[in-house]
């Protein structure tokens, strides 16, 4: 009940690299976390409640984008309603563009498993989409759902950043904007008063861990 009412937020300490705490987390997800059908219905931008109904209209919400070597952009989504299949032609409700879902995957760590179908409540990934950004909604025929962009907590930590070589400023900004697409909790600011580029994030570790390295600037 606490999880359903969003009054309880369990915290787990895990390390994927050393496989510490992962089993406990997975057991909790499998045994305790409510089914999607038990959760409150989600409201779209018009305030209409959308039930996670597998027989409903097809609608996907994209909540994360990452760029991976040799693959390119990987777009992560949740099936908000209906079912999605390989080869489905969908419409981007935010950008007005058409998109074909060539392949769909379920993801476990660094592993991607190709599947033919995902249903309402499932989380999956698609690769090499043409015009999909974090926060976009893709809909099937005769569906006009559009979901609000996820509201993230305000940034807690700020750090100034500059390239080793001044000639690399444009390249650095390009990398920062790409990282912003991958992690919307990043806020990039060009401070006129300080004449510095500032990055704001959720914590010091987050900024240190994800800041561009000299290798990225090549």
Language-model regions, residue ranges each:
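Conserved short loop/turn motifs at secondary-structure junctions
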Residues: 10-20, 191-204
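P-loop NTPase catalytic nucleotide-binding module
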Residues: 1-69, 124
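Generic, well-ordered alpha-helical scaffold segments in large soluble proteins
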Residues: 2, 28-35, 65, 83, ...
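Helix N-cap motif at beta-to-alpha junctions
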Residues: 130-131, 202-208
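Short, hydrophobic beta-strand segments
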Residues: 152-165, 192-200
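Conserved nucleotide-binding/hydrolysis modules and their immediate coupling elements
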Residues: 44-158
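Single conserved hydrophobic/aromatic residue that forms the stacking wall/gate
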Residues: 209-218
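Gly/Ser-centered flexible loop/linker motifs
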Residues: 168-194
């Amino acid at each position: 009940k606490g999880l359903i009412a969003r009054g309880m937020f369990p915290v787990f300490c895990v390390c994927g690299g050393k496989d510490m705490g992962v089993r406990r987390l997975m057991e909790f997800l499998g045994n305790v976390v409510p089914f999607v059908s038990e959760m409150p219905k989600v409201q779209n931008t018009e305030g209409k409640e959308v039930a996670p109904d597998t027989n409903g209209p097809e609608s996907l919400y994209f909540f994360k984008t990452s760029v991976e070597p040799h693959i390119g952009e990987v777009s992560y989504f949740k099936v908000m309603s209906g079912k999605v299949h390989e080869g489905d032609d969908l419409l981007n409700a935010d950008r007005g563009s058409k998109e074909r879902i060539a392949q769909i995957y379920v993801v476990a760590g660094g592993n991607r498993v190709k599947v033919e179908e995902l249903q309402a409540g499932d989380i999956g990934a698609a690769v090499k989409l043409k015009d999909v950004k974090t926060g976009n909604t893709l809909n099937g025929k005769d569906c006009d759902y559009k979901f609000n962009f996820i509201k993230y907590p305000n940034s807690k930590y700020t750090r100034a950043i500059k390239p080793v070589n001044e000639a690399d400023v444009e390249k650095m900004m390009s990398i920062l904007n790409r990282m912003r697409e991958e992690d919307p909790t990043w806020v990039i600011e060009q401070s006129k008063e300080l004449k510095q580029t500032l990055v704001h994030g959720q914590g010091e570790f987050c900024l240190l861990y994800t800041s561009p390295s000299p290798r990225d600037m090549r």
